[in-house]
Amino acid sequence: MAKSGGGGGGGGGGGGGGGGSGGLTCVTLFDNQINASKKEESESVNKNDTSKKMSVERVYQKKTQLEHILLRPDTYIGSVEPLTQLMWVYDEDVGMNCREVTFVPGLYKIFDEILVNAADNKQRDKNMTCIKISIDPESNIISIWNNGKGIPVVEHKVEKVYVPALIFGQLLTSSNYDDDEKKVTGGRNGYGAKLCNIFSTKFTVETACKEYKHSFKQTWMNNMMKTSEPKIKHFEGDDYTCITFQPDLSKFKMENLDKDIVSLMTRRAYDLAGSCKGVKVMLNGKKLPVNGFRSYVDLYVKDKLDETGVALKVIHEVVNERWDVCLTLSEKGFQQISFVNSIATTKGGRHVDYVVDQVVGKLIEVVKKKNKAGVSVKPFQVKNHIWVFVNCLIENPSFDSQTKENMTLQPKSFGSKCQLSEKFFKAASNCGIIESILNWVKFKAQTQLNKKCSSVKHSKIKGIPKLDDANDAGGKHSLDCTLILTEGDSAKSLAVSGLGVIGRDRYGVFPLRGKILNVREASHKQIMENAEINNIIKIVGLQYKKSYEDPESLKSLRYGKIMIMTDQDQDGSHIKGLLINFIHHNWPSLLKHGFLEEFITPIVKASKNKQELSFYSIPEFDEWKKHMENHKAWKIKYYKGLGTSTAKEAKEYFADMERHRILFRYAGPEDDAAITLAFSKKKIDDRKEWLTNFMEDRRQRRLHGLPEQFLYGTATKHLTYNDFINKELILFSNSDNERSIPSLVDGLKPGQRKVLFTCFKRNDKREVKVAQLAGSVAEMSAYHHGEQALMMTIVNLAQNFVGSNNVNLLQPIGQFGTRLHGGKDAASPRYIFTMLSPLARLLFPSVDDNLLKFLYDDNQRVEPEWYIPIIPMVLVNGAEGIGTGWACKLPNYDTREIVNNVRRMLDGLDPHPMLPNYKNFRGTIQELGQNQYVVSGEIFVVDRNTVEITELPVRTWTQVYKEQVLEPMLNGTEKTPALISDYKEYHTDTTVKFVVKMTEEKLAQAEAAGLHKVFKLQTSLTCNSMVLFDHMGCLKKYETVQDILKEFFDLRLHYYSLRKEWLVGMLGAESTKLNNQARFILEKIQGKITIENRSKRDLIQMLVQRGYESDPVKAWKEAQEKAAEEEDPQNANDDASSASGSTSGPDFNYILNMSLWSLTKEKVEELIKHRDSKERELNDLKRKSASDLWKEDLAAFVEELEKVEAQEREDVLAGMVGKPIKGKVGKPKMKKLQLEETMPSPFGRRIVPQITSAMKADASRKLLKKKKGDADSVAIKMEFDEEFGGVQAEGGGDDTVNTAASGTKTPKLKREKKEPGTRVRRAPSSTKSSAKKVKKRNPWSDDESKSESDLEESEPVIIPRDSLLRRAAADRAKYTFDFSKEEDDAHDDDDANNNNDLDELKVKASPVINDREDEFVPSDSVEKDEYDFSPVKSKPSPEKMSQEKKNQDFGNIFSFPSYSQKTDDDTTKLDSDEEDSTPVFSSPFAPKQTEKMLSKTVAAKKAKVDVPPKPKRAPKAKKMETVNSDSDSEFGIPKKTAAPKGKGRGAKKRKTSGSENEGEYNPGKKAPKSTPCKKSKKAAFDQDSDVEIFQSGFASETAPKPRTGRARKEVKYFAESDEDDDFDMFN
């Protein structure tokens, strides 16, 4: 019993010994199994039933856990079979290396469990400093010792055993079972050390605990089945723990610890030294030379080189206490060495992915930027170049198995974050990984190209459409074959016609579909997908990147030469250049073998009788004309393309192959340099110098009358690549610039100029379909490109939505596009109509056409070199274009502000600085630095969870904004949660309104971060590329807008002098003609002359004797034509010259062809009256200066501008105005609901756009960088412009007025303090109360918005919109406007009339000013120059506001022009940094300034207008800022006549101003400027009539629209003349 009990105990527990008579008997599990099986066999004899029962028990067995571990070890420690694989090991002779090792994973695991336990102790006791590892392969003993806190040597009260015996000798015991406790240790499941004990023949635990003053030692043997009694001793020293064990090698099928397993264990010792911070590791008595994780990584990368032979660069970052990361380049695919709580996770896991994903995400961004090959790079491909080392501490990690090779815990449970720094990523992108990835990409691209884009020599090839292959191509005579590449199918037909002469055996033809790819800058993907390139390679038999240095290698080609056959124009030259570039980039050696040649055809043929001359360049033809006296007798035919030649001519060309075939010869490195210069992206600055030198050379040649250089003379048989690039291709590059970059003079590109020329010539009185007009342009102006591009040009010229043109030269009759899609929503050109705008001929007076230099194309007189408008249109509508070497970008500026500056310059004053301005833009434009601006939209906080966006930055289109900004904010992404909960849209085609809902917390956060920034309502506008063609046709870079304005002014003033000379001559001739006619009639009536029954000769002789002159007008015109021909013989009109020269003798037809009716009394009186009128007109003209003529044109233009814009405002209101009630007088009422839906909420709090110091610093850095980088290039670009070196003008309007602020009720307007140097152009705030706000223009509309924004000094203070509205309403109440007149004027005033009113008014500093006017429409005081439009903020009276609140709301929406214009006053403001110094923003009224301004204005007005002074409504233009008040009328809202509080006259005054405006709008009503008008204006602006001073301030704000009153009538020089034909030229 005792024995069996002992055995049972031994078998079951394996812990104690059995009883017996003496020694200790050890019974193992296997002994029990053997004994049981023997017993079973003996008992099975003759016992069948029993046998069956025992067999079931054998099948279904229950094992103890210890038995299970020994029976199925792979479940716990991994395989116990030898495994061979690549592993990192540490060998004494080689160090750390990755080699093939054979080891038993189970043995490796039990060693690692003890090792990790030792490392875990560091997390329990930070004072632990040492781990000692001893491995004795000979005696098969392994020992691991560590100091630090030992295991408590105390008896466990529940289990009744000592704690060390419990945790090392009993399964399922651990200190890691409390999952609520966050631990960063390796132990987790309670198996680790026990598994080592179970698989050891001997396992000894020693530990000492200072706390309990005892040491403990106990030994287990025979796979933990036998144990000795623990030895407990008193202990006073330092704590320690030591585990010594002898692995049971038989369980691992091993005989001893071989070299491989020892190397692996040694590596783990090094792992511990690297991953366990602050612990020194001793191995076999020696301290390991590893000091931290970075030192450990060096064991791996030491002596390793990258593909370029450079040592690997390791990037290291200690992210925090728990994360240590190193990164370097991997050449063997992705590699990782990682540790979790000192456990070597050899298979990685989520912690590695967590780090690698961050690195890959950043690196792939860099790769994509630098990847020129076009190969798609995916994250896993980037990962393949990364070697990452991660050492981390994870709370309660989980693994996919007990072997702990792969960590599976989700990142969110790590207990810490590893956010790598930008410094780390920057270093990572420079450590060789990027270069390695790009090299791989390049290799892959090359492989793909070699596979797809190479060809081998075949006698026949298939699958290439339109190829006419040479019969001998690909055969033994292939080197003698030539492939003719033609420009298009029509040219191929010409070549095929010619093949009839030279045969098809050695010549093949292949048509190109246009310009081929510039392969030098193309991506791999582009080259792969380019059918043209692939076809050429296949046809010729080229092998990609193969060298053809050896002439023998050429035999592998199907063709020995390529002949390029293109049109003789500049685009044809470009195609030749691209083909040369294609061959040079890929097979440069082919150029040395004479592989390329070209086939030239005549561009002009001159024939006479049977003689025929061919010219291959225009300069050559011009030279011939110059030296051929009777060239007019020759028939001239121009050949614009190969398609012009007939089949007969084609045969003639090929018959004379020697003349038409030009060989390209390689002359050396200079040829390579020339080709690279023309096509390499790296040679941008060199190209600029190249083109600049060409333009300068051309200018000098023209000045000195020298002919232009040309190729292809009669003796030309070959040319070098250098000559081709510098004499032919450069013409294309220059023409590319001419097509892409506008002229400073008229702001037009050639295509636009052709459209304008055609429209002027057609002079349509009715609208014409855009598609039809495009055809007419192509016909009348010799346009040689596609008509589709022409139609788009016409559409662009007519667009007038916010962000397009400030002044559209064509009318958009139909859907020409809106701000919703940025014009892309325009209807098809077949469905829309257009015609000249009434402003076009006022901007480009017809009388100036006689002074222009018209060009000739195909011997056809086409558009002039440039038109000469009365203001610089390049500033009005801006410019944008990218050419060769240069690009141009110029924003729009306010039309009225430009007009005012021109007037100032005419008066000898300096122009005011100007800020960009876009018509109808209601946001703000603020100056950030020199030529740098910030464009801000408008956003209001309506309540605690609602914001309202009422304006977007310039050229941020509504639909795009919704899709790219609001939708992502609403839906959120994986990384970014949704910011807003909902939004609604209330836009029209002209206005913007998003009502956005968000939670109160998120709104508070967004406001703290800056609503403009969060909602992306700020964009930057940089004007550092103001490159334009000057009047001499040379590109010039302008530093400031003032430079452009001054250069234009000088040229335009000179042309006004020329115009006066021309008019004096023409009017003199007309006067003489009329005088002769009148005298003849009178003498005939008096009987002094008899013409009856006399011969023609006698009549002419008689007239000559009596002093009559030959037709004076005809003679004068002939004299002008002759002078023009002498000046420019090449462009002389042959037909006109020959016609004029054909007649000889005096011409008296103008007298003798008069009808008999001319002798009647009425006709005689009419003729005399006409004669006298012409003489007076001539005398008047002689008394006027060039400046006077210019001022008259400006006045007429401004007057018409008022009418046009008033009509536009009326059109906007179409459909919103109800029908008038029968019998009621007054304006019809607005459909209020429709308006309110699209209007800004009256209760919003405006958020003022902020310019942060960071934005300014960034702008300064960019400026410095630009100055450093551009020093040389600027010198190059500007080598011919010495006159201007100005710096960007400082603020035109220090601050933009916050419309919200302007609406404030307080008498004192709070001004937004601007940081020094910051100028703001603000459109009227979107607050309903301020009409101006409504006027705010989109960043792209210049005119009105500019003036207003400049004028308003925005107060940083945010004022609730509703109060503003009330004020505005009150102000409106002041003005009663008839929709017909006042309202129009109001609109005009809003735009410009504010200025007028202001000019006329004398303003008092009165706290109560028309809110709406003051707030929204600053008016210029009379003191300001007439031209001033700088807005002054007057303080609105709250009561007025309330009355007119509603009206103003409407007004704001529709007062489109937001003027941030600067007037003279404005400039003063700008000059002074102080807010008050600026009249516009000074306290509501600055009387002294105003008076001065008034005097200036009056003087200016006198000087300005030769026309009656009343037309000088220019002040109204200033009033434009009053737009707010006017806006009501604009919208058709009846304005209340109630006089402003206490000042009925104020209302009157307002009315007057309104009437003036109306006059402008309604040509029939023109109110002369009278004192009363001024009064009314006062009233309009303020309740106080004293507001005169204020006026000036406001005027500047609303860019004064020159009042129609100024010069309502244009001076007509010939209008009264009966002989209209003589003046046709002016029409």
Swiss-Prot record:
The record marks 515, 518, 687-688, 749, 783, 957 as: Interaction with DNA. Residues 1115-1144, 1224-1248, 1283-1365, 1378-1627 are annotated as: Disordered. Mg(2+) 2 binds at residues 567, 569. It comes from the Eukaryota. SMART domains: TOP2c, TOP4c. One of its GO terms (biological process) is DNA topological change. Mg(2+) 1 binds at residues 487, 567. Its EC number is 5.6.2.2. Keywords: ATP-binding, DNA-binding, Isomerase, Magnesium, Metal-binding, Nucleotide-binding, Nucleus, Topoisomerase. Residues 1381-1392, 1412-1428, 1616-1627 have a biased composition (Acidic residues). Residues 481-598 form the Toprim domain. The active site is at residue 831. Residues 1542-1552, 1566-1578 have a biased composition (Basic residues). It is found in: Nucleus, Nucleolus; Nucleus, Nucleoplasm; Nucleus. Residues 1339-1349, 1436-1448, 1462-1471 have a biased composition (Basic and acidic residues). It catalyses: ATP-dependent breakage, passage and rejoining of double-stranded DNA. Key decatenating enzyme that alters DNA topology by binding to two double-stranded DNA molecules, generating a double-stranded break in one of the strands, passing the intact strand through the broken strand, and religating the broken strand. Plays a role in B-cell differentiation. This is DNA topoisomerase 2-beta. It comes from Gallus gallus.
